[in-house]
């Protein structure tokens, strides 16, 4: 770890941050992450992905790390034990799905629990693309396929870039008590109120006995902003929107040029 920073915990977003456009971790970045974990620094992947979508990255790169999934709705420790979960109940999730189908044209919904990914149509090209990116498969179904007491960790909306802001505004107005955040120019995350990466980072640090003044985080998008502002050293990637870069404490190189390693080495 760079001697300029006194850090005991490092948190990293995945897509657009840890991974290149080819969805891989570079050798240099992998090496630097191994170095910090070998030196006793807590490393955690903080993503909007499901645990099943995060696990292949951990396995391929032999990371010893915790996992923040669903944009902060679920935390798993190094042994993949759930240590925190905050999601919607079935009734609320059903109301959101009903609203999307009635009011948001050409928007594909996805329902996520800790171990299930349900979609209306697996032949949808947007779903197929997401399956390839996260290396896991969705199941066709409806909200009724879940058990009555299930915890819905996230509803993901997929739409064209030009429809994203419109969809976000509509969902926010219809459900002011839910957390709504863009994770890319085509993806909208809908979660329980109070769910975000920053709150999950704080919760994990509390569990691990680490003070926030010893934390660092890397991110590239709007759903990372609260996390970047919550930690001591918030690092925006060089490929992040200008608005994110302006609010971050540090700006590094982009995800194609080892932005994480540049700060850690």
What are the roles of these predicted feature ranges?
Residues 64-70, 179-181, 234-238, 252-253:
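Short hydrophobic/aromatic-enriched beta-strand-loop microsegments
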Residues 36, 47, 71, 155, ...:
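Residue-level signal for inorganic ion chemistry
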Residues 6-22:
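Asp-based phosphoryl-transfer active-site loop
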Residues 61-63, 71, 174-176, 230-231, ...:
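Short, structured coil segments at secondary-structure junctions
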Residues 40-44, 63-65, 153-154, 213-214, ...:
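Short active-site oxyanion
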Residues 106-218, 225, 230, 239:
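Conserved acidic, metal-coordinating active-site core of Asp-based
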Residues 2-9, 25-26, 189-265:
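Mg2+-dependent phosphoryl-transfer enzymes with acidic/Ser/Thr/Gly-rich catalytic loops
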Residues 24-126:
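Active-site phosphate-binding/coordination module
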């Amino acid at each position: 770890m760079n001697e300029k920073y006194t850090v005991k915990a490092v948190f990293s977003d995945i897509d657009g941050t840890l991974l290149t456009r080819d969805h891989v971790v570079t050798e240099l970045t992998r090496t630097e992450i191994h170095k910090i974990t070998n030196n006793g620094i807590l490393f955690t992947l903080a993503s909007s992905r499901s645990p099943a979508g995060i696990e292949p990255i951990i396995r391929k790169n032999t990371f010893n790390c915790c996992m923040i999934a669903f944009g902060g709705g679920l935390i798993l420790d190094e042994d993949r034990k759930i240590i925190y979960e905050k999601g919607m109940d079935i009734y609320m999730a059903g109301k959101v799905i009903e609203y999307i189908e009635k009011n948001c044209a050409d928007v594909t919904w996805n329902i996520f629990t800790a171990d299930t990914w349900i979609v209306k149509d697996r032949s949808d090209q947007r779903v197929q693309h997401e399956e390839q990116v996260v290396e896991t498969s969705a199941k066709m179904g409806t909200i009724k396929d879940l058990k009555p007491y299930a915890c819905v960790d996230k509803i993901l909306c997929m739409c064209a870039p030009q429809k994203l802001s419109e969809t976000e505004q509509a969902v926010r107005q219809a459900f002011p008590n839910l957390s709504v955040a863009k994770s890319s120019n085509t993806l909208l995350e809908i979660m329980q109120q109070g769910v975000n990466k920053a709150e999950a980072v704080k919760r994990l640090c509390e569990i691990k006995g680490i003070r926030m003044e010893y934390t660092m985080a890397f991110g590239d998008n709007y759903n990372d902003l609260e996390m970047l502002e919550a930690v001591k050293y918030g690092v925006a990637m060089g490929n992040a929107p200008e608005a994110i870069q302006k609010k971050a404490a540090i700006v590094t190189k982009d995800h194609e040029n080892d932005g994480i390693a540049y700060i850690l080495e």
